[in-house]
Amino acid sequence: MSDLKCPFSGHTGAVTPAGNTNNGDWWPNQINLGILHQHHPASNPLGDAFDYPTAFASLDYSALKADLQTLMTDSQDWWPADWGHYGALFIRLAWHSAGTYRTGDGRGGAGHGNQRFAPLNSWPDNTNLDKARRLLWPIKRKYGNAISWADLIILSGNVALESMGFRTFGFAGGREDIWQPEEDVFWGKETGWLKDERRNDKGELNQPLAAVEMGLIYVNPEGPHGEPDPVASGRDVRETFARMGMTVEETVALVAGGHTFGKCHGAAPDSHLEAEPEGAALHEQGLGWRNTYESGKGEHTITSGIEGAWKPNPTRWDQGYFQMMFTYEWELTKSPAGAWQWTAKDVKPEHMIPDAHVAGKSSAPIMTTADLSLRHDAIMEPVARRFHLDQEAFADAFARAWFKLTHRDLGPRALYLGPDVPEEVQIWQDPVPPVTHPLIDEAEISTLKQQILASGQSVSALVAAAWGSASTFRGSDRRGGANGGRIRLLPQRTWEVNDPEQLNGVLTALETIQSQFNSSSSNGKSVSIADLIVLGGCAAVEKAAADGGHTVVVPFRPGRSDAGPEQTDTASFNVLKPLADGFRNWQRSGLPLRAEELLVDRAQLLTLSAPEMTVLLAGLRVMGANTAGNRQGVFTQNVGVLSNDFCVNLLDMTTRWTPTSEAQDAYIGRDSATGAERWSASRADLVFGSNSQLRAIVEVYAQNDGGSRFVADFVKAWVKVMELDRFDLRS
């Protein structure tokens, strides 16, 4: 039997398909284009016609919340609730779903229900959250597709808080589920759980990571690398929460608010835990961490390894967390599982905490090292003291921070669904003013395009400005984009990648055109700079195509508005500043990643396919949209003309490419017969001739019949990028 091979995988015996070598094993430096095509519609069992906002509108929202409220105290024998209340479990479920978000690239977070899949469903920090999702299954089954898993997980956390006496800030639905693991998220290079190989020479976390160890949401609760040092832990806490966009006040509120409820579980060493869900046996049916200690549940539960509750009344909202923290001195102890924790000394009888499962048993309050960082960190301690003395301020701060935590990656308010959406607008939502005037029509659009082209700005400058405005969009957290016209504001106006001097010329010309149009309009119509920036790019593309012999009309839909400085958090928008933009052949110096990897990463954030990435880069090159007039990759003698010259000349076998340095990040292309220099290129250019998949796409456009297809496909991809943030057009 050992000689028999599976006809599909080629494997013998019991070897798993994962043991098969793939292209990445043979050629580890090969770029991963698969991230551009993940979440293909074919993977979605709901089909292309399913519209989640429509389905959500049919939801009996009040009934759903009532069922969740009932669930909170409906303790199940197979996984008993602590103190008869599941509230803390569902707070942790929601928190750990949202808490993977990081501002560096907008990835992670609660927006897609990715906690259902590897690796998150099997992270050590998510131990036993598989049980929480199974507890939710009867409710998910009842309401079906009217509520996504992603929304249900977050809503369960909100209802949990409300069921224990806390008033939340609100809830918005709109998170659509994915149906396979995300391949684009870099969680770290470590090959073992709870390892830390993610810091630079200064000890700072490498970008875009926001957790201190592989498999953790934030910090090690026992302290950095398991060392119980509250001061050092404070630095980790502040850094990790800042990496997900939280202020110090929000950080303190979240830690204290979340730990107002429930307990830690460390009844015995984790050697009693069997494999996590992804590694568990088939018959476990997706459940992991089977516990062989005693009953394996209830008072015998093992999760973090820390054991105990933070305060009396663990199922009620109150000031107990801060009261315990600042009332008592804390003694370093070890849990039954061997984890470092801190136990209150000389506890008053009224502060002893009844056991979650065993009648007549009680324990002193505990704190983790991370908890005590709120008391010992010089920056967080004053905030914690203030919250201790002002319950109203603490409650308000926690409500707002919880809403921000659980909604940060949902996108703009235009995507919010449901009756509990708060009316108050938050600056972290990147608000744009509503459009309150009639929009320009086709005739006016045509006139404005003529005026823009006659303004003295080149095709290259107009295209670059429009691209710089729209390409800040990130499909990960739906931030950025052209709406709001923030490229005219700080910080974007001064970003090196946007070629500030050239950009200022474009903006000045467009502002003059805007002023003339708006002041002369007799029908109440106005046009925003945000619209004019995009329209200028569209007009330039039309001219570039016409100069190449192709008559095209680039679709343009007005309706963008101009945000002001008061609606723009400069620090928050600085995280959108690209490390590299291969589409403009620009890269910050000193980056460890190769230009082609950064290009694919940026294309994925722009939700582009490999063909879309190819045609856009090739078109932008020949139109001269590189930053600061960089000539790398401009494989044409007719700069400013939209043509397939990049593709044709890249595949020219009479050009011989050689690197110009040992780093092999820049190249010269010479005539193979004469040695005369023809072109210069970056890695982001030559990858389209080197990578077999990208070369196959380039060949389509370089063919004699590929010119018209190239222009048509460029226009289609261009419009897609210009409208990535136009969620108002889809509602």
UniProtKB/Swiss-Prot annotation:
Heme b binds at residue 259. There is a cross-link at residues 95-218 (Tryptophyl-tyrosyl-methioninium (Trp-Tyr) (with M-244)). Pfam families: peroxidase. Its cofactor is heme b. It comes from the Bacteria. PROSITE patterns: PEROXIDASE_1, PEROXIDASE_2, PEROXIDASE_4. Gene3D superfamilies: 1.10.520.10, Peroxidase, domain 2 (1.10.420.10). Formation of the three residue Trp-Tyr-Met cross-link is important for the catalase, but not the peroxidase activity of the enzyme. The active site is at residue 96. It catalyses: H2O2 + AH2 = A + 2 H2O; 2 H2O2 = O2 + 2 H2O. Residues 1-23 are annotated as: Disordered. There is a cross-link at residues 218-244 (Tryptophyl-tyrosyl-methioninium (Tyr-Met) (with W-95)). Its EC number is 1.11.1.21. The keyword Heme applies. GO terms for biological process: cellular response to hydrogen peroxide; hydrogen peroxide catabolic process. GO terms for molecular function: catalase activity; heme binding; metal ion binding. Binds 1 heme b (iron(II)-protoporphyrin IX) group per dimer. Belongs to the peroxidase family. Peroxidase/catalase subfamily. Homodimer or homotetramer. NCBIfam families: cat_per_HPI, PRK15061.1. Bifunctional enzyme with both catalase and broad-spectrum peroxidase activity. This is Catalase-peroxidase.
